[in-house]
Regions:
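Short, compositionally biased leader-like segments
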Residues: 1-26
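Short Pro/Gly-enriched beta-strand edge/turn motifs at strand-loop
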Residues: 26-33
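Context-gated lysine
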Residues: 33-34, 91
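Short loop/turn motifs at secondary-structure junctions and domain boundaries
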Residues: 37-40
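Zn2+-dependent cytidine deaminase-like catalytic core
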Residues: 57-155
């Protein structure tokens, strides 16, 4: 039996972002500028809003021995968990820039999606914003990015 999977999302203009989302975007852009990306020249920044109001950022860190580097999303999520292990994530925002400036928007890689899903399972689902220069993709439940993800129930 064939089935169809749909992912609900919204598109927002920059003017439709809340003041908090604009702050997260600015922090993610600042993080992206700190990325170490000498090979791809693709700089990604992530900003994580914690339930305690803290904002944690991360950037991608490349390595000549690919895939030994890490993505911005995992950098931010792991740092948040290491510093505040019992504080839930309330929101994740991702941006990217390259040599030409802002890119339209990017979606997390498979490894990042798995970490995002594990984080949501650990606490609660949270929204994810994929911010481009002109448009932001808003997904209310981050787990929708990995509908058939692996979890601890299989262990």
């Amino acid at each position: 039996m064939e089935r169809t999977l749909q992912v609900p999302y919204s598109t927002l203009t920059h003017d439709e972002l809340s003041p908090l989302d604009l702050e997260l975007e600015q922090r993610a852009l600042e993080a992206a500028k700190k990325a170490y990306a000498p090979y791809s020249h693709f700089h990604v920044g992530a900003a994580v809003l914690l339930a305690n109001g803290e904002i944690v950022t991360g950037s991608n860190q490349e390595n000549a021995a690919y895939p030994s580097g890490t993505c911005a999303e995992r950098t931010a999520l792991f740092w948040a968990s290491a510093q505040w292990p019992d504080v839930p994530i309330d929101k994740l925002l991702i941006v990217a820039i390259n040599d030409g400036g802002r890119v339209p928007f990017i979606s997390p890689c498979g490894s990042c999606r798995q970490v995002i899903m594990e984080t949501a399972t650990r606490f609660h689902p949270f929204p994810i914003l994929l911010c481009g220069g002109e448009q932001t993709i808003y997904i209310d439940d981050c787990r929708l990015l990995l509908p058939f993800g692996f979890d601890g129930s299989a262990l």
